[in-house]
UniProtKB/Swiss-Prot annotation:
Gene: TYR
Organism, scientific name: Bos taurus (Bovine)
Residue intervals annotated with topology Cytoplasmic: 495-530
UniProtKB keywords: Albinism, Copper, Glycoprotein, Melanin biosynthesis, Membrane, Metal-binding, Monooxygenase, Oxidoreductase, Signal, Transmembrane, Transmembrane helix
Sequence intervals crossing the membrane: 474-494
Record EC number: 1.14.18.1
Cross-referenced PROSITE patterns: TYROSINASE_1, TYROSINASE_2
Function: This is a copper-containing oxidase that functions in the formation of pigments such as melanins and other polyphenolic compounds. Catalyzes the initial and rate limiting step in the cascade of reactions leading to melanin production from tyrosine. In addition to hydroxylating tyrosine to DOPA (3,4-dihydroxyphenylalanine), also catalyzes the oxidation of DOPA to DOPA-quinone, and possibly the oxidation of DHI (5,6-dihydroxyindole) to indole-5,6 quinone.
Cofactor requirement: Cu(2+)
Descriptive protein name: Tyrosinase
GO annotation (BP), single: response to blue light
Keyword Signal: yes
Molecular function in Gene Ontology: metal ion binding; protein homodimerization activity; tyrosinase activity
């Protein structure tokens, strides 16, 4: 009944975030390299007549890149989105969207002036109706074609530079699976050759801001699809977990008793078909994923390579990550040491902070542990546990931001791997967002986490803690300095007093001080003339 009711709401709401807007998938838009669709409210491009935005040239960052990608002009994702479009909508004030038809995160209302703060909650804190609604929303998104977005099934070159558009419809859920595939896929070099050392959303500084935006857009899509403006993605707090406690039919799907690699027939997700999971096949054909179904969702939690991932992350691991003061370091990739980002992502040891190519920990550990569809980066978003997992990873990122209050320039401006500089536009989003745009507190984007709200009184203490620790380290020096200072002050005071007394005794009467010494002052009698 709930699912049927949700379907009835579908065409009452329009989506506003994703990859290629349907309105910009024509040969005219591609050959003119312009994506400035009209806003339905006034019929003008980008809602210009209503002051919502205007069509403007895309200004690309010229900051130098790291050495990881030695090519130029071979990948459609380079200098995003310039291969496809060099003019897009630039929205004003709190407006957002490919046609400036929606509001920035954290705002709502007809003029996007009303602030709002949504709260992401632990999935185990949801009531049964709330949990069932969440599962139904995911199922609806999986089976509803995106009204506003399509996915390209060929490169720009394969489209004859835009004259022969190649696009397919895709469901709301699979749109995000496709985006995660597209951002992390290998570069196609021709003749079955590929370049693998490239990823516009992982293994570099943009990992956390990119996934922050990704979840916000996914959340927003489901809000608009269902008409539930208060929907938020729940999180799974996997600290100290001994097994996959969300892997039950009540939640994200239990194990199939007949085949441990499949989900239980009683699960919401056992009938789901996955997409974009066959990277090597696409590479051999020099093709892109076209959204075709590729079989059932696979998951066999715990039966993974335990030499690479001995256990799930602990509370101590998380605390160590949060103790790392540097967001990024060194080469700014998966070899970075003492980098908060690299340690949280799982390429560095959460005990030492040293990069270790033989181990997968923290964020990576959960992907490996699931031992199935979620364990391969490009297609990992097929598994809905991806949402719960990345919501919790994002909450750890939020803890770090609140602890250190970094300025924007803490995020690297230059020399990061391709696509990861601060001013680089994030692939493959249209409208456009820069990496640095989401190096901000979640509250600035209109959401919070329930368990961080509970610890709100400790935020001030966290803020001053580094200063208190510094004061504690220099306390012995301060005491010693105070003692020496007191002795010097007493000696100098005595010498000054002695010199002043001698000088006073030598002064003529008219230059004697009006007040006498303390012992003489007490001998004076106030005499009245009355």
């Amino acid at each position: 009944m709930l699912l049927a009711a949700l379907y009835c709401l579908l065409w009452s709401f329009r989506t506003s975030a994703g990859h290629f807007p349907r309105a910009c998938a024509s040969s005219k838009s591609l050959t003119e390299k312009e994506c400035c669709p009209p806003w339905a409210g006034d019929g003008s491009p980008c809602g210009r007549l209503s002051g919502r935005g205007s069509c403007q040239d895309v200004i690309l960052s010229t900051a130098p890149l790291g050495p990881q990608f030695p090519f130029t002009g071979v990948d459609d994702r380079e200098s995003w989105p310039s291969i496809f479009y060099n003019r897009t909508c630039q929205c004003f004030s709190n407006f957002m969207g490919f046609n400036c038809g929606s509001c920035k995160f954290g705002f709502r209302g007809p003029r996007c002036t009303e602030r709002r703060l949504l709260v992401r909650r632990n999935i185990f804190d949801l009531s049964v109706p709330e949990k069932n609604k969440f599962l139904a929303y995911l199922t609806l998104a999986k089976h509803t074609t995106s009204p506003d977005y399509v996915i390209p099934t060929g490169t720009y070159g394969q489209m004859n530079h835009g004259t022969t558009p190649l696009f397919n419809d895709v469901s709301v859920y699979d749109l995000f699976v496709w985006m995660h595939y597209y951002v992390s896929r290998d570069t196609l070099l021709g003749d079955s050759e590929v370049w693998r050392d490239i990823d516009f959303a992982h293994e570099a500084p943009g990992f956390l801001p990119w996934h922050r935006l990704f979840l916000l857009l996914w959340e927003q899509e489901i809000q608009k699809l269902t008409g539930d403006e208060n929907f938020t993605i729940p999180y799974w707090d996997w600290r100290d977990a001994e097994n996959c406690d969300v892997c039950t039919d009540e939640y994200m799907g239990g194990r199939n008793p007949a085949n441990p690699n499949l989900l239980s027939p009683a699960s919401f997700f056992s009938s789901w078909q996955i997409v974009c999971s066959r990277l090597e096949e696409y590479n051999s054909r020099q093709a892109l994923c076209n959204g075709t179904s590729e079989g059932p969702l696979l998951r066999n939690p715990g039966n993974h390579d335990k030499a690479r991932t001995p256990r799930l992350p602990s509370s101590a691991d998380v605390e160590f990550c949060l103790s790392l003061t540097q967001y990024e370091s060194g080469s700014m990739d998966k070899a970075a040491n003492f980098s908060f980002r690299n340690t949280l992502e799982g390429f560095a040891d959460p005990v030492t902070g040293i990069a270790d190519a033989s181990q997968s920990s923290m964020h990576n550990a959960l992907h490996i542990y699931m031992n199935g569809t979620m364990s391969q980066v490009p297609g990992s978003a097929n598994d809905p546990i991806f949402l719960l997992h990345h919501a919790f990873v994002d909450s750890i990122f939020e803890q770090w931001l609140r602890k250190y209050h970094p300025l924007q320039d803490v995020y690297p401006e230059a020399n990061a791997p391709i696509g990861h500089n601060r001013e680089s536009y994030m692939v493959p989003f249209i409208p456009l967002y820069r990496n640095g745009d989401f190096f901000i507190s979640s509250k600035d984007x209109g959401y919070d986490y329930s368990y961080l709200q509970d610890s709100e009184p400790d935020i001030f203490q966290d803020y001053i803690k580094p200063y208190l620790e510094q004061a504690q380290r220099i306390w012995p020096w301060l005491i010693g300095a105070a003692v020496v200072g007191s002795v010097l002050t007493a000696v100098l005071g005595g010498l000054t007093s002695l010199l002043c007394r001698r000088k006073r005794n030598q002064l003529p009467e008219e230059k004697q001080p009006l007040l006498m010494e303390k012992e003489d002052y007490h001998n004076l009698m106030y005499q009245s003339h009355l």
